[in-house]
């Protein structure tokens, strides 16, 4: 008989960022365990709050199915000797299958007799198997863990209670002295402990005790309350998804409430107010319909509406203190000149082996000047880049950024404009940090893009120069994120810069300054490989097929925009019959070209038939076509230049024996193929493209 099963893990409050990954991990482990045990089940529900992780499995079978198996052993001529007695091979097979030799059967397979063993394994009761879930619970991993009392188990937070209920029956096991039972607990202040009679009643029973166990239901309730307040007050409440997720996992019973702050604080930059409310207090800022920030906020309490006015006043008091501090920092910062702030960077260590922040700024200045030239920026933009680079990091020494590190760049822009810098310079200072995370916007201005590239490139290359290379999950300087940011900037801006040239130039510059602790040539190869792997990661995330990505990355690393353009073109063509034929022809050329001897050049005097001359002419047309196409970054035209020589290639192979007996003729034909192959492989390695049968 199928019955529902509930597993609930009660904990001290988990950090909000732990909740979703933890319940996802637990749900995946439980489902994998059920599948491994061969147990049939219905729908699986996940429930998670700061104080509990729970899995409800509907219609869980009461036992495993019986297993009937038949295994083939050795051939009969090996299983029995001349006297008909069982050999060691047969005895060993029978023992391995857990049967007697008298139970072995003989069957013919393709005309040969073999011995077979039939085994019957009775399925175990589910109630006997379920205690194994203890190992799944103790096997959960967390970003940080702790130990408590004298127990050896490391966990996110101390375990407070355990529920394991199969139908009406408790599944017995214990963890760190906590025994499983049917008793769970409601809201810490509004609810009470209570027994569960049946797993199915879990979510509804908790609601009666002021706990909304379903995270999506809590999130929807919060959004609904925010929308209601918007309508009541004619406000606009921008919903930051990260903040919404965090608040959802901070409460078990959400109730939204509003508060206000003094109008005078609106004189502070909008970003300062939003950061103070959102990042430090987990409040939702409130705006007017025209986008102006209003002196109100919305917060979400973990409880009901009782004494809500007092709660609002308490939150207002906390925010007032925070904003007063911010106002003090803001006014104090403006007493320091940009030059004085910049000079303090010489006293801040970026890394003991790479130098100070002042030295980093100098490197950024040199790199950005070179990048601006390579990107063909105009004279005005170059001046903007030069000035922005010179003062790029001055805001790091301000009180405001010291208190709110997430405002670096933003405060640089604000203070730079107040100090008389041009809006273009100020914006570039802000944009140097973009993109800050996956999916974030890239710089809008050319100057900002160049400064962002220089900053990120210096961080990556300088770390590599002293052996700080990401390994596995270890990436303390976020070099993967920095490299990914570089790739997205190059892709969106279409700058004619290659990752390889950028990395090599930056490394050579660092080497000249004496910061290298690693071998230069080895580090260059590590950097090129690192950027290629990051590019592959970004392309796969963009949805390109792995084989097309591998094909494109096998070609020289040209500018990122062109790499993506080639991948898009190949993706569009991938299912065309003609594309398959083109790929086969091009691959045939590149495959045979591997046999070409080095140092041999094509000689028309050694041609013996017209197809050789035609292939040479086609090769010259391909070279010209590719050159013209890449001048305007036209991946389609470049592909067409290759595709148009398909018929000529096929005719050549139909009428010409490449591996001729005469060595000179053979080498000349291989050299001809090698010349064409170089053009083909400059686009992609077509041999890596996979076609479905």
Swiss-Prot record:
Primary subcellular site in the record, as a coarse category: cytoplasm
A single GO BP: arginyl-tRNA aminoacylation
Gene Ontology CC entries for this record: cytosol
Gene source species: Shouchella clausii (strain KSM-K16)
Keywords attached to this entry: Aminoacyl-tRNA synthetase, ATP-binding, Cytoplasm, Ligase, Nucleotide-binding, Protein biosynthesis
SUPFAM superfamilies reported in the protein's UniProt record: HD-domain/PDEase-like (SSF109604)
One Gene Ontology MF term: arginine-tRNA ligase activity
Record flagged with keyword Protein biosynthesis: yes
Principal EC category: ligase
Superkingdom of the source species: Bacteria
Protein name as annotated: Glycine--tRNA ligase beta subunit
Family per similarity comment: Belongs to the class-II aminoacyl-tRNA synthetase family.
Disulfide bond annotation, renumbered to this chain: none
UniProt subunit comment: Tetramer of two alpha and two beta subunits.
Coiled-coil region: none
Subcellular location: Cytoplasm
EC number: 6.1.1.14
Substrates-to-products reaction catalysed: tRNA(Gly) + glycine + ATP = glycyl-tRNA(Gly) + AMP + diphosphate
HAMAP family noted in UniProt: Gly_tRNA_synth_beta
InterPro entries: DALR_anticod-bd (IPR008909), Gly-tRNA-synth_bsu (IPR015944), Gly-tRNA-synth_heterodimer (IPR006194)
């Amino acid at each position: 008989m199928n019955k529902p099963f509930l597993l609930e893990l009660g904990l001290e409050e988990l950090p909000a960022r732990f909740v979703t990954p933890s319940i996802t991990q637990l749900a995946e482990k439980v489902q994998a365990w059920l599948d491994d045990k061969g147990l049939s089940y219905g729908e699986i529900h996940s429930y998670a709050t700061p104080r509990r992780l729970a899995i409800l499995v509907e219609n869980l079978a009461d036992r495993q199915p019986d297993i009937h198996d038949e295994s083939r052993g050795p051939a009969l001529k090996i299983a029995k000797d001349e006297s008909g007695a069982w050999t060691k091979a047969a005895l060993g097979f029978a023992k391995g299958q857990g049967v007697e030799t008298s139970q072995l059967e003989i069957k013919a397979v393709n005309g040969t007799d073999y011995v077979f063993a039939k085994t019957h394994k009775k399925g175990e009761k589910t109630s006997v198997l379920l205690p194994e879930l203890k190992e799944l619970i103790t096997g959960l991993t967390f970003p940080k863990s702790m130990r408590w009392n004298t127990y050896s188990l490391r966990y996110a937070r101390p375990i407070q209670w355990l529920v394991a209920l199969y139908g009406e029956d408790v599944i017995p096991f214990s963890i760190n002295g906590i025994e499983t039972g049917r008793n769970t607990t409601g809201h810490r202040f509004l609810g009470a402990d209570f027994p569960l009679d049946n797993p199915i009643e879990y979510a509804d029973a908790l609601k009666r005790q002021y706990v909304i166990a379903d995270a999506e239901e809590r999130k929807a309730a919060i959004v609904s309350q925010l929308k209601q307040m918007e309508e009541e007050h004619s406000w606009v409440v921008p919903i930051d998804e990260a903040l919404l997720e965090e608040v959802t996992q901070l409460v078990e019973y959400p109730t939204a409430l509003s508060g206000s702050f003094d109008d005078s604080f609106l004189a502070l930059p909008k970003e300062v107010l939003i950061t103070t409310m959102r990042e430090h207090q987990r409040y939702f800022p409130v705006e007017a319909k025209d986008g102006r920030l209003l002196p109100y906020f919305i917060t979400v309490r973990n409880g009901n509406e009782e004494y809500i006015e007092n709660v609002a006043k308490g939150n207002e008091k906390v925010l007032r203190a925070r904003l007063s501090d911010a106002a003090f920092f803001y006014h104090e910062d403006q007493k320091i000149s940009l030059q004085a702030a910049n000079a303090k960077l010489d006293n801040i260590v970026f890394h003991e082996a790479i130098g100070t922040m002042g030295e980093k700024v100098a490197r950024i200045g040199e790199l950005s000047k070179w990048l601006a030239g390579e990107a063909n920026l105009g004279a005005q933009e170059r001046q903007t880049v030069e000035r922005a680079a010179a003062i790029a990091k001055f805001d790091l020494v301000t009180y405001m950024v010291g208190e709110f590190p997430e405002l670096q760049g933003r405060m640089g822009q604000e203070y730079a404009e107040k100090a008389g810098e041009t809006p273009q310079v100020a914006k570039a200072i802000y944009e140097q940090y973009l993109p800050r995370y996956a999916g974030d916007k890239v710089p809008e201005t050319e100057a900002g893009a160049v400064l962002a590239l220089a900053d990120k490139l210096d961080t990556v290359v300088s770390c590599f120069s002293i052996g700080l290379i990401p390994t596995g999950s270890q990436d303390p300087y976020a070099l993967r994120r920095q490299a990914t940011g570089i790739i997205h900037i190059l892709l969106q801006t279409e700058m004619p810069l290659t990752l390889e040239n950028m990395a090599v130039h930056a490394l050579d510059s660092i080497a000249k300054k004496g910061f290298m602790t690693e071998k230069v040539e080895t580090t260059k190869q590590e950097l090129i490989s690192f950027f290629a792997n990051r590019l592959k990661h970004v392309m796969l995330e963009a949805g390109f097929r792995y084989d097309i990505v591998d094909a494109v990355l096998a070609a020289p690393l040209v500018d990122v925009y062109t790499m993506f353009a080639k991948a898009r073109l190949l993706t569009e063509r991938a299912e065309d019959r003609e594309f398959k034929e083109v790929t086969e022809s091009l691959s045939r050329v590149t495959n045979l070209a591997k046999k070409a001897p080095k140092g041999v050049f094509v000689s028309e005097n050694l041609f013996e038939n017209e197809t050789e001359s035609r292939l040479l002419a086609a090769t010259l047309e391909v070279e010209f076509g590719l050159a013209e196409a890449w001048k305007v970054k036209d991946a389609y035209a470049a592909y067409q230049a290759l595709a148009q020589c398909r018929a000529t290639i096929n005719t050549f192979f139909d009428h010409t024996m490449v591996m001729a007996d005469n060595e000179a003729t053979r080498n000349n034909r291989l050299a001809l193929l090698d010349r064409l192959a170089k053009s083909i492989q400059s686009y992609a390695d077509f041999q890596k493209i996979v076609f479905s049968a």
